[in-house]
Amino acid sequence: MLGIPGGLTCFPSSGVGALHTGTGAGIIFPWEDGLDLRLHQAARLGSRSMSAIVDFECPPLNEVICGLHFRRMDRFTAPYVGLLWQKFQTHYPKCEVHPPLTLVSEQDTELQLEMSSFPRVWFVSEDSTRLVQVQQDLLIHNWRQVESSTSYPRYKIVKDGFDDALSKFEAFVADHGLGAVEARQYELSYVNFVPQGDGYESLGELGRLLPDFAWRRNTSRFLPDPSNVNYQTVFDLPNNNGKLRVSIQDALRRSDEKKLTRILIVVRGMHQSQDVSTPDDWFELAHEWIVRAFLDLTSEEVQVKHWRKK
């Protein structure tokens, strides 16, 4: 479900469920299922600009995903894909076809899965760092790191790319009488990869990177250090605006057999309150929670020494 430097192969985990929005390539995940620790956040943190919260010179960020799941548009069928690509082709000259994705809604009290036989189409930029994914009930804009030298263009640019893609898609379906884009759920996801050696040398030392996931290491205990980890935690956003999910997994980069820890932070939901009353409000809230969650979860020593927190 990820996009990482090219030339790699991915065996995705079922980890966080819901929108499976990443771009796949490059990482092996040993686990299929994980420990589900359900935690809850009581109140919204005070509002501050992201620049006032944090800035890293070398962040471990690998991919950012902005997505919208909408009511399925059955009239948007295969013949329209080529016509839609024409609207994107100037900035996304490459096109790929992939199997459709499934939504698991954070808003429903009961688990609801919807499958479609219609494929998912990728419109990919020339340098492969940006892509738009479209299917009958889904639109996603991704930024991904394809080379180690590729720098993150900042959240606003990724969000602007999503807004532009959504505007083009809404105009297209209106022009062709395919129906309206009825939003059901938004998503913002950040994917980070931290190599072993950046503050920790093994999974037994994972607490030096992620203090909440420390492994007790002493000679009197029976169990050795873990060989694999797959932790998941869930936090409620305020006023029923959605959930924040954190997934911690060990992984292996195929290109150099480097051991990594993936920190995936996903927020899904809808604007449900007076202070979060528009899609832009919701994405701002989601972005704030992701940034603050990352700071809260990771050790300050690693933030300063390895990611060069300013």
Predicted region positions:
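Aromatic/basic-lined ligand-recognition segments
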Residues: 119-131, 181-256
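Secondary-structure boundary elements
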Residues: 160-182
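Long, compositionally biased interface segments
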Residues: 256-310
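Glycine-rich, often proline-containing surface loops adjacent to acidic residues and nearby aromatics
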Residues: 60-68, 132-153, 181-191, 259-272
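N-terminal low-complexity, intrinsically disordered segments
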Residues: 43-136, 140
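Short, positively charged and aromatic/hydrophobic N-terminal segments
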Residues: 27-28, 32, 36-41
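Serine residues within intrinsically disordered or low-complexity segments
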Residues: 13-14
